[in-house]
C-alpha cells in the first residue's frame, strides 16, 4: 500500500473519531464538550439527564449510523462490481423493496384487519417491524439467488431485480389503498429511514451481526478483483463465474437486508461512497477499495446523522432526505472532475 493511500486511510479513520465525538456533543440539547468527555471517560459527576442522553440516545444512534454506513457502502461496491454498472447500489435487486413490502404487510394490515396499530405497541412494534423487514428482504434475496443460477447474463438478472422492486412497490400501493390513515402515516415514517430506532439489546444484536458479516465480505476481495477483468478472463484464471456471482450477491443482499431491517431503507450511501473512494484513491483494486468504502461509508453516515439531528433545534430531519442532499453533490462533483481530467488528457 502506497504512503499516500495509507495517509488517506488514516485521515478518514481520524475523521470518524472526530465525527463520533461530535455526534455525542451536538444535538437538540446542548451539552458542554468537557461534560461529554467526562461522561464517556466515567470521571466526575455530570447531571443524570445528560448521562442518559449520551448513553441511551446519542451513542447508540452514532454507532448505528457508523455500522449501517459501512455495511451499505460495502454492499454498494459489491453490486457495482458484480454488475459492472456505476448506477448499481444496495437496493438495485429489489431487496430493500422486499423489506418495505414485509413491513407494509405488518403495518398497513394491522389496523385494517381489526388488530392493534403497531404505532401503539412501542418497543414490541419496533421488533415486529425488524422481523418483518428481515423476512421480506431475505425472501426477495432467496428469489434473486435462485434466478441467478438460471440466467447467464448480469443484465438479465439486473432487469429481473428491478422488476421485483416494481412488483413490491405495486403491492405496497394496494395495501396503502385499503389501509387506515394512522397505519399509512406509521409506514411512511418508517420509510424515511432513521438511525435512532436501534437501542439497547437491539443495538447490540445489530452491531454483533454486522461485525460478523462485514469481515466475511472481505473474503471476496480476490473474487471481486477477478470479476473486474470480465467473465472470459476471470474464467480462464479459474474463477467459477456463477458461484462467484452467487457469493457476492448473497453478501451484498444480506448486508442490505440487515441494515434495512433495523434502520429502514437508507438511500444513496451505497451508491455514492464507492464513487467517492475510487476518485480519492485513484484505483479499482478492492484490496484498497474495501477498507476505504468501509471507513468512508461510516464517516459519511455520521455526517448525515449529525445534519439530520440539526443541532440546536427540536426534532430531526429524515435521514433519507439528508443522505440524498449530501450524496448527490458528491457524485456530481466526482463525475465532473473525472470528465475534466479526461478532457485535459
What is each stretch, according to the model?
Residues 1-345:
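Alpha-helical transmembrane segments in inner-membrane proteins
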Amino acid at each position: 500500500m502506497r504512503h499516500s493511500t495509507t495517509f488517506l486511510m488514516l485521515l478518514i479513520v481520524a475523521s470518524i473519531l472526530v465525527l463520533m465525538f461530535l455526534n455525542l456533543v451536538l444535538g437538540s440539547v446542548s451539552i458542554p464538550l468537557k461534560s461529554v468527555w467526562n461522561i464517556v471517560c466515567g470521571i466526575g459527576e455530570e447531571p443524570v439527564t445528560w448521562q442518559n442522553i449520551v448513553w441511551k440516545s446519542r451513542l447508540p444512534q452514532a454507532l448505528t449510523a457508523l455500522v449501517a454506513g459501512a455495511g451499505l457502502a460495502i454492499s454498494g461496491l459489491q453490486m457495482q462490481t458484480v454488475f459492472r454498472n456505476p448506477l448499481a447500489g444496495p437496493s438495485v435487486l429489489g431487496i430493500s423493496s422486499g423489506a418495505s413490502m414485509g413491513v407494509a404487510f405488518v403495518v398497513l394490515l394491522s389496523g385494517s384487519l381489526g388488530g392493534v396499530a403497531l404505532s401503539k405497541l412501542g418497543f414490541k412494534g419496533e421488533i415486529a417491524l425488524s422481523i418483518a423487514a428481515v423476512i421480506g428482504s431475505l425472501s426477495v434475496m432467496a428469489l434473486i439467488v435462485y434466478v441467478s443460477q438460471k440466467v447467464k447474463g448480469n443484465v438479465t438478472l439486473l432487469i429481473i431485480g428491478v422488476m421485483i422492486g416494481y412488483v413490491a412497490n405495486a403491492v405496497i400501493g394496494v395495501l396503502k389503498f385499503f389501509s387506515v390513515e394512522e397505519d399509512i402515516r406509521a409506514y411512511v415514517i418508517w420509510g424515511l429511514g432513521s438511525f435512532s430506532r436501534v437501542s439497547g439489546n437491539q443495538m447490540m444484536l445489530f452491531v454483533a451481526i454486522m461485525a460478523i458479516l462485514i469481515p466475511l465480505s472481505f473474503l471476496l476481495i480476490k473474487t471481486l478483483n477477478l470479476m473486474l477483468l470480465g467473465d472470459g478472463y476471470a474464467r480462464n484464471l479459474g474463477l467459477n463465474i456463477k458461484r462467484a456471482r452467487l457469493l457476492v450477491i448473497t453478501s451484498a443482499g444480506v448486508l442490505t437486508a440487515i441494515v434495512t431491517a433495523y434502520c429502514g431503507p437508507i438511500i444513496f450511501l451505497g451508491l455514492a461512497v464507492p464513487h467517492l473512494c475510487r476518485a480519492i484513491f485513484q484505483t479499482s483494486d478492492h484490496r484498497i477499495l474495501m477498507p476505504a468504502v468501509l471507513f468512508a461509508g461510516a464517516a459519511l453516515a455520521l455526517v448525515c446523522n449529525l445534519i439530520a439531528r440539526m443541532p440546536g433545534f427540536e426534532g430531526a430531519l429524515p435521514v433519507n432526505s439528508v443522505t440524498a442532499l449530501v450524496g448527490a453533490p458528491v457524485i456530481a462533483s466526482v463525475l465532473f472532475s473525472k470528465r475534466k481530467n479526461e478532457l485535459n488528457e
